[in-house]
């Protein structure tokens, strides 16, 4: 039987600003990526997100970002190796404080937004993130784009790596994600997205935006929780995976 993790980026409200349907989404995923304050999230939101994750038996992961609240972490920044490492460590530490207080552990770490996209192609940046994780806790799984520079960096730092694929994003011919700024970057057809997910899991392939067949590995599927259809979408994905006899379970159970 195929096994796959279903993850979502949550805990992205802060202050008076509310985002997503975290309480509902957490009923359907196996892992959650928790914003750590640099692109979204705040101490109270982190606390509540972990409470909800614990109630639903969902594993937690740190979701570090560039320091970019105004741009939601989606703007690229030129930072040094040490800055990248320290920003990641700082955010890991923030999540760890809440996790420890609640008797929980950090299962994985997944970079957010522009930091994620840059680390997928810049091995030096990926190495900085992996060094931060390895120095913090070598048992934490590094979650990143399938067949990217992050995979190689994790190997070099002795970390377990989970290959992530996206249900609602289009791919370039080189396996990177199509920029959100471009037409066709987001897949709005739920049935098409589900078919693509099943193909990625069972055949280890996806069709790029230009029609090219790309090889990849699907350990974890990301379903975004920041749009109006997110809840129905994640419900349908879970239902269809079960129909295909694909077991949904957290990364720690098979990576």
Curated annotation (Swiss-Prot):
Keyword set includes Nucleotide-binding: yes
Entries under SUPFAM superfamilies matching the protein: Glycoside hydrolase/deacetylase (SSF88713)
Pfam family, one: LamB_YcsF
Broad enzyme group: hydrolase
Chain segments annotated as transmembrane: none
Enzyme Commission number(s) from the entry: 3.5.2.9
Keyword ATP-binding: yes
InterPro entries for this protein: Glyco_hydro/deAcase_b/a-brl, LamB/YcsF/PxpA-like
Annotated catalysed reactions: 5-oxo-L-proline + ATP + 2 H2O = L-glutamate + ADP + phosphate + H(+)
GO molecular function: 5-oxoprolinase (ATP-hydrolyzing) activity; ATP binding
Keywords: ATP-binding, Hydrolase, Nucleotide-binding
GO annotation terms (biological process): carbohydrate metabolic process
Record's function text: Catalyzes the cleavage of 5-oxoproline to form L-glutamate coupled to the hydrolysis of ATP to ADP and inorganic phosphate.
Subunit structure: Forms a complex composed of PxpA, PxpB and PxpC.
Recorded family membership: Belongs to the LamB/PxpA family.
Protein name (record): 5-oxoprolinase subunit A
Organism name: Campylobacter jejuni (strain RM1221)
């Amino acid at each position: 039987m195929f096994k796959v993790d279903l993850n979502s980026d949550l805990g992205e409200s802060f202050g008076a600003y509310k985002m997503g349907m975290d309480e509902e989404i957490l009923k359907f995923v196996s892992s959650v990526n928790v914003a750590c304050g640099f692109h979204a999230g705040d101490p109270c939101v982190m606390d509540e997100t972990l409470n909800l994750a614990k109630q639903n038996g969902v594993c937690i992961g740190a979701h570090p970002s560039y320091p970019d609240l105004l741009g939601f972490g989606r703007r690229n920044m030129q930072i040094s190796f040490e800055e990248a490492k320290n920003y990641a460590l700082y955010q890991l530490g923030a999540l760890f404080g809440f996790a420890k207080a609640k008797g929980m552990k950090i299962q994985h770490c997944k970079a957010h937004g522009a930091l994620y996209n840059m680390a997928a192609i810049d091995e030096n940046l990926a190495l900085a993130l992996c060094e931060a994780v390895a120095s913090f806790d070598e048992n934490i799984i590094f979650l990143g784009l399938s067949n990217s520079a992050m995979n190689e960096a994790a190997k070099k730092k002795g970390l377990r790596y989970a290959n992530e694929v996206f249900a609602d994003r289009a791919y370039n011919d080189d396996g990177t994600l199509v920029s959100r700024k471009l037409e066709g970057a987001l897949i709005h057809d739920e049935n098409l997205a589900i078919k693509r997910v099943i193909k990625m899991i069972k055949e280890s392939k996806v069709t790029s935006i230009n029609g090219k067949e790309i090889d990849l590995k699907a350990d974890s599927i990301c379903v975004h929780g920041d749009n109006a259809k997110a809840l129905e979408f994640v419900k349908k994905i879970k239902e269809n995976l079960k129909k295909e006899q694909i077991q949904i379970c957290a990364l720690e159970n098979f990576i």
